[in-house]
Amino acid sequence: MRFAYGRLPWRRGAVLGSALLVLVTAPAASTATERSGPAPARSVILLIGDGMGDAEITAARNYSVGAAGRLAMDTLDASGRRTTYAVDERGRPVYVTDSAAGATAWATGRRTVNGRVSKSHDTDRPMPTLLELARDRGYATGSVTTASVADATPAALTAHVTDRSCKGPADMAACPADTRAGGGEGSIAEQTVAARPDVLLGGGADHFAQTVTDGPFRGRTVTQQARAAGYQVVRDRTQLAAARPGRPVLGLFAPEYVPVEWTGPPAAPGGTAPQRCATRNPGRPAGTPDLAESTRAALDLLTARAHHRGAPGRGFFLQVEGASIDDRAHEADPCGQLGETLAFDRAVAAALDHAERHPRTLVIVTADHGHATQILPHDARPAGLSATLVTDEGGVMQLGYGTALPGETQEHTGVPVPVAARGPLADRVRGVQDNTSLFGTVTAALGLR
């Protein structure tokens, strides 16, 4: 069955704040069964709306399906809140997290320093990730993003570096101990290939085009390293559709971030005239798959890959990130932000459709952190940047961005983010939880610990 979303009557479930985790699961199990019997879940799909807090979701809902409507991500059954904070090197709270520390929290179950990727806050040592644990237990694994596949959120599953900027072999200035010459495992791109997820889809071609400087692939690009490891390297939707599950797939659809879907005037001092967003970006190449397409492709490839492996009860672990919600909010670009939020919601719908066809499925939705967006009275005169939009239902909505001076990058916020779930173990997300709690939910669902 396919879900019909839009102006729906209220269903059990909460307004989500940011990311969606779909777990393919079995009937709820007791704690003893989780420890000693079959895992409650066969597969997990974790979808992350980067920077997609309550205001970002509400703005997208208002603009598209209306204030009384419901997005796909609004339809999950159990809901709660997650804290979002990092720590410093001494373990003291840092109340606003970045995406690296935020992703490390759910990927490893431990907090770390802002900018650090799946390494400890005090000793700077690698910490095992959900993807690594799932892979080592025989699950197929994958990561889909609209950022570079070497960006902070996907990197938290596949790499361990001191600083998130160390994406390719030429980017290692902030990570001397992580270089191969320094005794480390190399850049995020190199480590990601070495981690060997079955599916990697997103941007980041420029990072993979860099030349490896040390180790067995010295003098070759990271893309060549991937091909040597058996990866099918695809560059557009046609090549993605032709990929086969017998070998791992690396999709590089853009030099860095995948171009956004919508465009429009940015927020400005004193506001803008009421406007509509342009729902087609002329700067987006025609062959670029959208996030829902990439999600469906990854689900099909991983399902087939898991079946081919034949491990009893083992499906897959997949993370899907809508990265440019955060990127566009940083730039006070309301139309870009709304378009990416709605593109993410279509990926959520694709995941829910998959889960409906594969009944051992649990869905969890959350975010890494909040962002700068505020929904203001249409006649307000805010001190910061603002833009006024005319929604699909004919309303007037003013969005404000006031966490930085005009011309500077808007900031994350330290608020809790919504989390919601559907399926067995969904009740684990209820209440107010720590931002490391998803690690425990996923490991329990897949029987990883």
UniProtKB/Swiss-Prot annotation:
Where in the sequence is the signal peptide annotated?
1-32
- Location in or out of the cell: Secreted
Q: Where does Mg(2+) bind?
A: 50, 151, 153, 321
Keyword terms, alphabetized: Antibiotic biosynthesis, Hydrolase, Magnesium, Metal-binding, Phosphoprotein, Secreted, Signal, Streptomycin biosynthesis, Zinc
Task: Please tell me one Gene Ontology term that the record gives under cellular component.
Answer: extracellular region
| Chain residue ranges for the region called Disordered | 268-290
Q: Where does Zn(2+) 2 bind?
A: 50, 368-369
Keyword ATP-binding (UniProt): no
Give the EC number(s) under which this enzyme is classified.
3.1.3.39
Gene3D superfamilies xref list? Alkaline Phosphatase, subunit A (3.40.720.10)
Give me any GO biological process, just one. streptomycin biosynthetic process
Q: In which pathway does it act?
A: Antibiotic biosynthesis; streptomycin biosynthesis
Quote the cofactor binding remark. Answer: Binds 1 Mg(2+) ion. Binds 2 Zn(2+) ions.
Q: Pfam families attached here?
A: Alk_phosphatase
Quote the record's binding site residues for Zn(2+) 1.
Answer: 326, 330, 412
Q: Which cofactor does it need?
A: Mg(2+); Zn(2+)
Superkingdom to which the source organism belongs: Bacteria
Which catalysed reactions does the entry list for this protein? streptomycin 6-phosphate + H2O = streptomycin + phosphate
Q: Name one GO molecular function term.
A: metal ion binding
What is the protein's major site of localization? secreted
PANTHER family the record matches: ALKALINE PHOSPHATASE (PTHR11596:SF5)
Tell me the protein family, please. Belongs to the alkaline phosphatase family.
Annotated function = Specifically cleaves both streptomycin-6-phosphate and, more slowly, streptomycin-3''-phosphate during the biosynthesis of streptomycin.
Protein name, UniProt field: Streptomycin-6-phosphate phosphatase
From the broadest rank down, the organism's phylogenetic lineage runs:
Bacteria, Bacillati, Actinomycetota, Actinomycetes, Kitasatosporales
Name the gene that codes for it: strK
